[in-house]
């Protein structure tokens, strides 16, 4: 997905269990950022794109950077590693979904909200 410069749409409940948004894909870095302090600028590329999408790093703990790879984080190293596995699995499922049904539409907002809130909402009750 990062190499295609596309965000990962929400097609299924596994994705919605982790976030209510498509996994964003920040644009490729400009030449001046690549030539500068590359790692530092990558962080700004991520934060700037989340802001442009109206998202917070607390809402979405994963992002793609165009022509690069996924970046993940969490409350600790274990959560960041877990999120890395999640984004890889979500990416595979989304690709297979599009191959099986090129006209597929993202999930309904009501189902996205239900799956996210039951695990992360104020009255959460479900966790695997």
Where in the sequence are the language-model features?
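Glycine-rich flexible loops
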Residues: 1-128
């Amino acid at each position: 997905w990062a190499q295609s410069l596309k965000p990962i749409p929400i097609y299924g409940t596994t994705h919605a269990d982790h976030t209510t948004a498509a996994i964003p894909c920040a644009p490729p870095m400009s030449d001046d950022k690549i030539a500068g302090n590359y790692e530092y600028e990558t962080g700004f590329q991520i934060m700037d794109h989340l802001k442009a999408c109206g998202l917070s790093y607390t809402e979405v703990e994963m992002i793609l950077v165009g022509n690069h790879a996924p970046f993940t984080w969490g409350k600790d190293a274990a959560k960041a590693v877990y999120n890395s596995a999640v984004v890889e699995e979500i990416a595979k499922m989304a690709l297979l979904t599009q191959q099986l049904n090129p006209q597929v539409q993202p999930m309904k907002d009501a189902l996205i909200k239900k799956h996210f809130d039951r695990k992360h909402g104020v009255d959460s009750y479900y966790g695997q």
